[in-house]
């Protein structure tokens, strides 16, 4: 699968953001709203056989499916407060999408924006994305604020655009590099639930940023050779 929402907003004297996010947060086309949360990750296999095994393990994982469904329910609730009653629909659940370095489970939820509601109203109501807060949303954000000692900066926010024609498209700011003051930062993480295993969650976080880190290592080595 291709990145549905990747961007490089550009650089200025303060730095630059390079975003390769595979996750769509909110899209508005006319009155149709679309959100596509990701929950469930496995790395790509070293060969075709192992890759198929990892795909199957992800698709059959009750834990990953439960996490994904939890976020689907959260986002349906977020959309429901501004969208037409009865229009919020889970079009696809747990769809396997494969990228260069990982496999993901992706669900697709659509709705019809209610009369008098704008894309900006929708973004204000749904931000931050439920796939990176967890549920219950408000309490989860309070706990995150209590436990995390540092700001997430751009990580887990959103990058997007508003068109003069009323369209909007935004992502969840993951798989992203922040370049400032001669430093490059990237972040990786995963959802924590009752049956999470620390080692597996840590490995999932590493898998998500593996391609970014390896690319940076290659660029560093290439730069050193050219010097």
Named regions from a protein language model:
Residues 1-227:
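Extended alpha-helical targeting/anchoring segments
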């Amino acid at each position: 699968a291709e990145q549905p929402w990747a961007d490089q907003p550009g650089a200025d004297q303060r730095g630059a953001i390079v975003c390769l996010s595979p996750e769509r947060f909110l899209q508005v086309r006319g009155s149709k709203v679309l959100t596509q949360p990701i929950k469930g990750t496995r790395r790509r296999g070293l060969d075709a056989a192992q890759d198929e095994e990892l795909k199957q393990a992800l698709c059959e994982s009750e834990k990953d499916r439960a996490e994904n469904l939890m976020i689907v329910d959260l986002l349906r609730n977020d959309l429901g407060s501004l969208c037409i009653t009865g229009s919020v629909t889970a079009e696809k659940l747990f769809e396997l999408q494969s990228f260069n370095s990982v496999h993901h489970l992706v669900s697709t939820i659509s709705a019809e924006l209610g009369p008098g509601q704008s894309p900006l109203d929708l973004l204000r109501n749904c931000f931050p994305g439920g796939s990176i807060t967890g549920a219950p949303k408000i309490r989860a954000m309070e706990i995150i604020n209590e436990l995390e000692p540092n700001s997430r900066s751009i990580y887990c926010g959103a990058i997007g655009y508003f068109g003069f024609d009323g369209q909007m498209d935004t992502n969840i700011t993951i798989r992203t590099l922040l370049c400032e003051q001669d430093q490059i930062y990237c972040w990786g993480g995963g959802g924590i639930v009752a049956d999470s295993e620390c080692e597996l969650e840590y490995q999932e976080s590493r898998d998500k940023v593996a391609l970014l880190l390896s690319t940076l290592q290659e660029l560093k080595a290439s730069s050193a050779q050219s010097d």
